[in-house]
């Protein structure tokens, strides 16, 4: 039966590891790459079949990278060992996207530049986070910081925390960004109120709020482009 087919029964040049070594990682599909990470299958299922099932259950690689420990271990045959391998892969991906951008000066010229900087990291988050990007007079990024976690509202978002960090970094401009775990980046009334409050405080302190970017699953919205800044 196909379900009992073992990796060793697959022609050697079609096995993920051998294929990678012979032809390069870029020749492998997502299922084959995931199979190399997982290394082994489960009872009655080889590692390629397991990888295909995971990709199907989570509707693609994005879904796997967004999954929590409970999400992954709820899948039949997946224990904490394999779940930890997947979670480690997801964390490496997030860190790569963050640290890659730190290797060079980044100049912000448009909302697209902001989205390119943070989208890979923030679009995968399941908890709402407010991130601040600090810039110098030339719009070069000089730092970022997550300042709030959880549902955002004007009662918990304190501008002093944002501007204290901006002053410490000698930042003359800031951009605030947060994600909507629902996937819909449409700004809420609270999002707009928070934006206006931070903008007003910035004007008093001489630190300009350039934009507020809201990240969704498949896109983003710039409150500056929408006319709120």
Curated annotation (Swiss-Prot):
Motif JAMM motif positions after renumbering to this chain: 178-191
InterPro entries on file: MPN, RadC_JAB, RuvA_2-like, UPF0758, UPF0758_CS, UPF0758_N
GO molecular function, one term: metal ion binding
Residue ranges of every copy of the MPN domain listed in the record: 107-229
Pfam families in alphabetical order: RadC, UPF0758_N
Keywords carried by this UniProt record: Hydrolase, Metal-binding, Metalloprotease, Protease, Zinc
GO BP: proteolysis
Residues given in the record as Zn(2+) binding sites: 178, 180, 191
PROSITE patterns recorded: MPN, UPF0758
Sequence similarity: Belongs to the UPF0758 family.
Protein name as catalogued: UPF0758 protein CLH_0547
């Amino acid at each position: 039966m196909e379900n009992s087919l073992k990796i060793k029964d697959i022609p050697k040049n079609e096995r993920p590891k051998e294929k990678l070594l012979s032809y390069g990682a870029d020749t492998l599909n997502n299922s084959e790459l995931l199979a190399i990470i997982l290394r082994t299958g489960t009872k009655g299922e080889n590692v390629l079949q397991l990888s295909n099932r995971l990709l199907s259950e989570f509707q693609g690689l994005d879904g796997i990278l967004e999954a929590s420990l409970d999400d992954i271990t709820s899948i039949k045959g997946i224990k904490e060992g394999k779940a930890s391998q997947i979670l480690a892969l997801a964390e490496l991906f997030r860190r790569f996207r963050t640290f890659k951008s730190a290797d060079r000066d980044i100049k912000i010229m448009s909302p697209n530049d902001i989205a390119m900087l943070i989208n890979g990291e923030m679009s995968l988050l399941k908890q709402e986070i407010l991130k601040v990007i600090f810039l110098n007079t030339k719009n070069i990024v000089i730092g970022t910081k997550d300042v709030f976690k959880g549902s955002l509202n004007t009662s918990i978002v304190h501008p002093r925390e944002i501007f204290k960090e901006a002053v410490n970094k000698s930042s003359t401009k800031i951009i605030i960004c947060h994600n909507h775990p629902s996937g819909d980046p449409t700004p809420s009334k609270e999002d707009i109120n928070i934006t206006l409050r931070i903008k007003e405080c910035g004007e008093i302190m001489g630190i300009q709020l350039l934009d507020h970017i809201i990240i969704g699953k498949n896109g983003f919205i710039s409150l500056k482009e929408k006319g709120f800044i």
